[in-house]
Design a protein with these regions (language model features):
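Short, Lys/Arg-enriched anionic-surface-contact patches
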Residues: 1-11
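Helix-turn-helix DNA-binding motif, specifically the short coil turn and the N-cap/start of the second
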Residues: 2, 26, 35-40
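Short alpha-helical "packing" element that flanks the helix-turn-helix/winged-helix DNA-binding module
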Residues: 16-17
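Short helix-to-turn junction characteristic of helix-turn-helix DNA-binding domains
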Residues: 20-23
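Alpha-helical residues within the helix-turn-helix
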Residues: 32
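Residues within the DNA-recognition helix of helix-turn-helix
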Residues: 44-47
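C-terminal flanking helix
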Residues: 49-56
Length: 75
């Protein structure tokens, strides 16, 4: 079996996607729940969408992490 490269999704990115796409909240409402500005929320969504797309398109494992210093690795 080949080793998979990982895409790391941080907890705040997971929370953003949950609030917006799963719970159906508008960006302004979701940003308030997270205690961040709407522009920051929009950047977070953009970042996590790109990570998820990278994982799906390139066959990478998607890992959820609490560590913002963790980088993409090969497993």
């Amino acid at each position: 079996m080949r080793e998979l490269e990982e895409v790391i999704i941080l907890r705040d990115e997971l929370e953003a996607i949950k609030l917006h796409d799963y719970d159906g909240l508008e960006q302004t409402e979701a940003a308030k729940k997270m205690g961040i500005s709407q522009p920051t929320f929009a950047r977070t969504l953009d970042r996590v969408y790109k990570k998820i797309a990278d994982g799906i398109i390139n066959g990478k494992a998607i890992k959820i992490s609490d560590d913002p210093n963790q980088i993409t690795s090969t497993r």
